[in-house]
Amino acid sequence: MKVNISNIIVSINKNQEKEIYKELERNGISRDNIENLKYLRKSIDSRKKNDIKFIYTLEITLKKNINLEKYTKLSLAKEEVYEKRMALYPKREVAVVGTGPAGLFSALRLAELGYIPIVFERGEEVDKRNATTKFFIKTRILNPNSNIQFGEGGAGTYSDGKLNTRIKSEYIEKVFKELIECGAQEEIFWNYKPHIGTDVLRIVVKNLREKIKSLGGKFYFNSLVEDIEVKNNEIKALKILEVDSQKRY
């Protein structure tokens, strides 16, 4: 049985773990009955400068079921919704344009479902892009296709990796899990204002690419999608410019 417990308030000056387990006991959860404890959120209440508090939300896997109706802070945890499904056309190639967050996670999902994502990116892979960007900062000579805006990871690669969204989606947990698996700090999963950090973000992007490749995906960098060929309201082909050779196909 998995349950969530919210609004656990602990003074910043107290032993956090000890106080959390005290609150769990008050809500019918003994330490002996806990199989696993996971932080879902941690925020700070700093309205009173002399009494700053942490506020926690936890997910707890219990060894034995308990009666949730007795405790207002407890609720049944949601089941995983991002299940794997069978591909309609397994091993079919699907084009993905761009390696920003949308492109990378689209490619990952397609690969998980058994498709072969073919990813086209006008810029360079992240390590080469970083060298090109440093060269631009030093010389002011711009590579129009690989720079601070374009290249693996998208424009956000040179941000501090803040993880903001205005939507409430059940898939956010999946995204965070993938980021952590690819090298992000586990704290992003439960911090109120999570961010990865620029240096770590580059590692995460590279590892995410390698995971997609391990599932059968293919990446073509320095490949600019110039146009889309449409016939009878169906996409038939992509027109690609190979940036280095200037060849079109």
What are these regions (language model features)?
Residues 87-102, 118-120:
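Beta1/beta-strand and adjacent pyrophosphate-binding region of the FAD-binding site
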Residues 243-249:
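Core beta-strand elements of the Rossmann-like FAD/NAD(P) dinucleotide-binding domain
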Residues 4, 49-51, 128, 134-219, ...:
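Conserved N-terminal/central alpha/beta ligand/cofactor-binding core
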Residues 115-122, 126:
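Short beta-strand "acidic-cap" motif of Rossmann-like dinucleotide-binding folds
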Residues 1-92:
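Extreme N-terminal leader/targeting segments of oxidoreductases
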Residues 109-110:
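Aromatic pocket-lining residues of Rossmann-like dinucleotide-binding sites
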Residues 38-44, 221-236:
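A conserved short coil-to-beta-strand element within the FAD-binding core of flavoproteins
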